[in-house]
Amino acid sequence: MSDILEKIAAYKRDEVAVRKAAQPTIAPPAEAPRGFRAALTRAHAPGRLALIAEIKKASPSKGLIREDFDPPALARAYEAGGAACLSVLTDGPSFQGDDSYLAAARSAVRLPCLRKEFLVDPWQVAESRSLGADAILVILAMVDDVLAAELMAEAQRLGMDALVEVHDEAEMARAGALGADLIGVNNRNLRTFEVDLSTTERLATMAPAGALLVTESGIFTPADVARLERCGAQAMLVGESLMRQADVTAATRALLG
């Protein structure tokens, strides 16, 4: 585990302990989840990647990304630009996120939403659903296979999708063994923070049959999108390059081509 992930995991375990003690059991909302993976499948077409557009105020590596930060307005802009799904950062200490951003963004659109959060306890899956999330993120660099399987099983129980994130060959093999059907390849090296799109090109050859492959990080231009589509990616998660634009809708349309 990288230094930054170790730091996040440590404070997240403390945070979850407090939240869990205050609310040990969480009832899911009556509304069924919006199908996250299904929306990506519908949006993907030959020569066109489905887009998971991310609502992210800041990051540890880049600091503040967008000062004019209005989650509902950003969600509507992404939807108008052609995004298939949303990803919303809720972690506060490292990303200046907040749980309220997820509910606010989701209520403004019809798109399925991923809660971009660092999960260290299956309790957080139920919490995510109660906040309106339709999908969760399982970062294999952060959890062992036992915990990953528990997170995925809890998501399935609640009718949610699980995006299983990998960074290298060993993690892709683990994702396959876990039966992941939605796999995200993070092009960012979590130790150096350098981004290399060839990570997706390399790991795509190992993706299990039937899994929907999402490429994440470092996607800025239509040329990047075309390159990643050629290697077998079916969807992309893009945040920073769109969040920095004055006209988010136009930037989203331009990226999708």
UniProtKB/Swiss-Prot annotation:
Q: SUPFAM superfamilies given for it?
A: Ribulose-phoshate binding barrel
InterPro entries recorded: Aldolase_TIM, Indole-3-glycerol_P_synth, Indole-3-glycerol_P_synth_dom, Indole-3-GlycerolPSynthase_CS, RibuloseP-bd_barrel
Q: Does the keyword Amino-acid biosynthesis apply?
A: yes
Q: Which cysteines are joined by disulfide bonds?
A: none
Among PROSITE patterns, the record links this protein to: IGPS (PS00614)
One GO biological process from the UniProt record? L-tryptophan biosynthetic process
Query: Amino-acid biosynthesis among the record's keywords?
Result: yes
Q: In which domain of life is the source organism classified?
A: Bacteria
Q: Which GO terms describe its molecular function?
A: indole-3-glycerol-phosphate synthase activity; phosphoribosylanthranilate isomerase activity
**What Enzyme Commission number does this protein have?**
4.1.1.48
- Which keywords does the record carry? Amino-acid biosynthesis, Aromatic amino acid biosynthesis, Decarboxylase, Lyase, Tryptophan biosynthesis
Q: In which pathway does it act?
A: Amino-acid biosynthesis; L-tryptophan biosynthesis; L-tryptophan from chorismate: step 4/5
Q: According to its UniProt record, which reaction does this protein catalyse? A: 1-(2-carboxyphenylamino)-1-deoxy-D-ribulose 5-phosphate + H(+) = (1S,2R)-1-C-(indol-3-yl)glycerol 3-phosphate + CO2 + H2O
**What is the uppermost EC class here?**
lyase
Task: State the family named in the UniProt similarity comment for this chain.
Answer: Belongs to the TrpC family.
The name this protein goes by in its record? Indole-3-glycerol phosphate synthase
